[in-house]
């Protein structure tokens, strides 16, 4: 049994960082406890070691710390999360402590929040469909178990409502399999936290959810730990309890701002727009924890949500996120201003694994052909609308006018399904056929004749 040493050699506090001198046998990422002069305990983590000095990152902030009277203890292990199946249905703060008034967890074990590196050879390829109940995602940008598919939003757009809708509605089609949602919120307001909790409570979805809430008035440094704690809970449920877990993380922009704050306090050389040069590497340690493992029944699927500063998709946060993840769902100010909910820009959005989770036995045999045809028809319809603005509607051919009609109905009925309508994949595919039947059969060149014969007669415009 190792002896825990106590130090009173704190020499400096700069923002969220503390320097402790004359330390030995201290390791990187080690958990630290700081006992203040009034008996209060705060936690931190070793960020850097140089000779006999350790730099400690404080999770609860540095206000009120008296350097001379503070006692520092190094725990001998990294920050760990107490995990148990009883986590499901509970609400925790950003550090994993219950805040729902329920009893403390009786932990089955303690897990390092940084997780374990996954050998690429042991990864299984994502190829099974997850139904979100949202047509623009399920049909056109299909989400697959084990995928990481971010949502790129902008200021004033309803990404919180979309996140809540996915958390309420997401499911796997095989009802025999256990499904859970892990929700990690970083830097959200009290009103937003109440919105998420109430939305899940009133639909009963909270019974299959685990919520981790880091509020805007919580220490920014806590935001660095929150997504790691949430992913640790997800990995436990997926790979030890054989559950299919969907992890929703919002807002990743707040997480990156916390990284920038720590980097500035460490006086590191800034990278693009003041963010640390290791932002890409740091984000990858989160996003790459999604996936499936050979020999394991469970899976971890991620939907990170971020707000693009100034709606700039070339900003470092969405730019680097796009490199690591497998596509993106982009929300549109134009569609939002027209009253469409959710305002998903389907032409700019992409799921790189959509072909792996669709087809006979997963969704339906007409999934991919109708998806391609809807994309083509909608893109053509938008071109015709632009042409009509320049030349006038009188210059449009009869087929062009049908494309305009299709585009209008596609946006009003398909995209604009609302935040409280849950469409299963069958209803979505049937709606797609109904809209495609507006166009002449000769225009449906991306669908084979046997599928046209099977499905087109079944719909009426």
From Swiss-Prot:
Q: Name the family.
A: Belongs to the ATPase alpha/beta chains family.
Instruction: Give the InterPro entries listed for this entry.
Output: ATP-synt_VA_C, ATPase_F1/V1/A1_a/bsu_N, ATPase_F1/V1/A1_a/bsu_nucl-bd, P-loop_NTPase, V-ATPase_su_B/beta
Quick one: signal sequence residues? none
Please state what the protein is called: V-type ATP synthase beta chain
Keyword field contains Heme = no
Q: Which GO terms describe its biological process?
A: proton motive force-driven plasma membrane ATP synthesis
Q: Which Pfam families match?
A: ATP-synt_ab, ATP-synt_ab_N, ATP-synt_VA_C
> What does the UniProt record say this protein does?
Produces ATP from ADP in the presence of a proton gradient across the membrane. The V-type beta chain is a regulatory subunit.
UniProt gene name = atpB
């Amino acid at each position: 049994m190792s002896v825990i040493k106590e130090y009173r050699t704190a020499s400096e506090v700069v923002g969220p960082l503390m320097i402790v001198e004359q330390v030995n046998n201290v390791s990187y990422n080690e958990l630290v406890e700081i006992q203040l002069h009034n008996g209060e305990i705060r936690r931190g983590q070793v960020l850097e070691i140089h000779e006999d000095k350790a730099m400690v990152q404080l999770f609860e902030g540095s206000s009120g710390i008296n350097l001379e009277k503070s006692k520092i203890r190094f725990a001998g292990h990294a920050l760990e999360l107490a995990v148990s199946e009883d986590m499901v249905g509970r609400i925790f703060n950003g550090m994993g402590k219950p805040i729902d008034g329920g009893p403390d967890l009786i932990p089955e074990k303690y897990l390092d929040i940084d997780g374990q590196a996954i050998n690429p050879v042991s990864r299984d390829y994502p190829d099974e469909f997850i139904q979100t109940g949202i047509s623009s995602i399920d049909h056109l940008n299909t989400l697959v178990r084990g995928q990481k598919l971010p949502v790129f939003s902008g200021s004033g757009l309803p990404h919180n409502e979309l996140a809540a809708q996915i958390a309420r509605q997401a499911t796997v089609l095989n009802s025999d399999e256990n499904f859970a949602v892990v929700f990690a919120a970083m830097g959200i307001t009290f009103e937003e936290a109440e919105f998420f909790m109430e939305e899940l409570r009133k639909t009963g979805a909270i019974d299959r959810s685990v919520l981790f809430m880091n509020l805007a008035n919580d220490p920014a440094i806590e935001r660095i730990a929150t997504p790691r704690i949430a992913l640790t809970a997800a990995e436990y449920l997926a790979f030890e309890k054989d559950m299919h877990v969907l992890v929703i993380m919002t807002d990743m922009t707040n997480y990156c701002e916390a990284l920038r704050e720590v980097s500035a306090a460490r006086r590191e050389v800034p990278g693009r727009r003041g963010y640390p040069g290791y932002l890409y590497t740091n984000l990858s340690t989160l996003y790459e924890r999604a996936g499936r493992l050979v020999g394991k029944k469970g899976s971890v699927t991620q939907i990170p949500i971020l707000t693009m500063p100034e709606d700039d998709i070339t900003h470092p946060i969405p730019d680097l996120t796009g490199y690591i993840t497998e596509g993106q769902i982009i929300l549109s100010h134009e569609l939002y201003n027209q009253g469409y909910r959710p305002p998903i820009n389907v032409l700019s959005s992409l799921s790189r694994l959509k072909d792996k989770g669709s087809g006979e036995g997963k969704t339906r045999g007409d999934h991919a052909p109708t998806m391609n045809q809807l994309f083509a028809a909608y893109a053509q319809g938008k071109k015709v609308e632009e042409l009509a603005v320049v030349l006038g509607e009188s210059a449009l051919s009869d087929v062009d006018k049908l494309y305009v009609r299709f585009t209008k109905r596609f946006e009003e009925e398909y995209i604009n399904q609302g935040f409280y309508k849950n469409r299963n994949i069958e209803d979505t595919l049937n709606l797609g056929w109904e809209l495609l039947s507006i166009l002449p059969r000769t225009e449906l060149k991306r669908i084979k004749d046997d599928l046209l014969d099977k499905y087109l007669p079944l719909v009426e415009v």
